[in-house]
């Protein structure tokens, strides 16, 4: 399924899948490099990697990202705690194809724009994280910012590579996607990706039909609830 992008979230050297981002919940999947190799050998050509420790300011897992980049994936996108030009350049130098930004876009736009200028628009994806209030979540999903539509408009102005819509309410729960996302998909310029709550093949079919290019999968994927997946 070429539209599926498996996610590997890394915390303290382990691949994990949290429930709504809460530390200590969900699954511990083991060595992230070994997991990435399994995914590659299963035929997945794209991968979504998040450094949870860097995002939370309690460390970084770049050494694992560096090794994952050597495996041979066609596409690697990385997010989590990228808050300065130097780190952005360092990750790109590892052959990461695109970097993912979220909070900084809405809290420090000048810094974000400087990073974009340094690494190029075509290497930047913005994750618009949101919940049932339909407002953008920032600062570790603890605060709410502007409405989703306004967030999309703000990002569209920069003509970046694309946008991920991340439905935090059901993230890691396998409880299903946000079906109202169809109203936002048509507004996005560039590559359209979705994450959060994907629980079945029918969810994936719906997202494809409303215009998403790629679907990022996590908990349901590793619980083998999606057709054709049997990785762990």
From Swiss-Prot:
Biological process (GO), any one: L-histidine biosynthetic process
Chief place of localization: cytoplasm
Catalysed reactions listed for this entry: 1-(5-phospho-beta-D-ribosyl)-5-[(5-phospho-beta-D-ribosylamino)methylideneamino]imidazole-4-carboxamide = 5-[(5-phospho-1-deoxy-D-ribulos-1-ylimino)methylamino]-1-(5-phospho-beta-D-ribosyl)imidazole-4-carboxamide
Pathway: Amino-acid biosynthesis; L-histidine biosynthesis; L-histidine from 5-phospho-alpha-D-ribose 1-diphosphate: step 4/9
Domain of life: Archaea
GO molecular function, one term: 1-(5-phosphoribosyl)-5-[(5-phosphoribosylamino)methylideneamino]imidazole-4-carboxamide isomerase activity
Coiled coil: none
Enzyme class (EC, first level): isomerase
Location in or out of the cell: Cytoplasm
Active-site residue numbers: 9, 129
This enzyme's EC code(s): 5.3.1.16
InterPro entries: Aldolase_TIM (IPR013785), His_biosynth (IPR006062), Isoase_HisA-like (IPR044524), Isoase_HisA-like_bact (IPR023016), RibuloseP-bd_barrel (IPR011060)
Keywords, sorted A to Z: Amino-acid biosynthesis, Cytoplasm, Histidine biosynthesis, Isomerase
Cellular-component GO terms for this entry: cytoplasm
PANTHER family recorded: 1-(5-PHOSPHORIBOSYL)-5-[(5-PHOSPHORIBOSYLAMINO)METHYLIDENEAMINO] IMIDAZOLE-4-CARBOXAMIDE ISOMERASE
Family: Belongs to the HisA/HisF family.
Protein name: 1-(5-phosphoribosyl)-5-[(5-phosphoribosylamino)methylideneamino] imidazole-4-carboxamide isomerase
């Amino acid at each position: 399924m070429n539209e599926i992008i498996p996610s590997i979230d890394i915390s303290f050297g382990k691949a994990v899948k949290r429930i709504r981002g809460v530390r200590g919940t969900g699954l511990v999947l083991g060595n992230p490099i070994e997991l990435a190799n399994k995914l590659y050998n299963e035929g997945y050509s794209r991968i979504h990697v998040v450094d949870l420790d860097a995002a939370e300011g309690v460390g970084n897992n770049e050494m694992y990202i560096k090794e994952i980049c050597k495996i041979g994936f066609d596409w690697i996108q990385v997010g989590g705690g990228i808050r300065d030009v130097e780190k952005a350049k360092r990750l790109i130098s590892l052959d990461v194809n695109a970097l993912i930004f979220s909070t900084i876009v809405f809290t420090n736009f000048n810094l974000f724009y400087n990073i974009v200028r340094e690494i190029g628009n075509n290497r930047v994806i913005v994750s618009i994280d949101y919940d049932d209030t339909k407002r953008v979540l920032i600062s570790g999903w603890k605060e709410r910012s502007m409405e989703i539509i306004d967030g999309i408009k703000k990002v569209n102005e920069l003509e970046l590579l694309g946008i991920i819509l991340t439905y935090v309410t059901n993230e890691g729960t396998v409880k299903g996607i946000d079906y109202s996302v169809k109203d936002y998909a048509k507004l996005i310029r560039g590559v359209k990706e979705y994450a959060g709550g994907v629980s079945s093949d029918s969810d994936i079919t719906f997202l494809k039909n409303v215009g998403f290019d790629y679907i990022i999968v996590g908990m349901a994927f590793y619980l083998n609830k999606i057709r054709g997946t049997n990785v762990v």
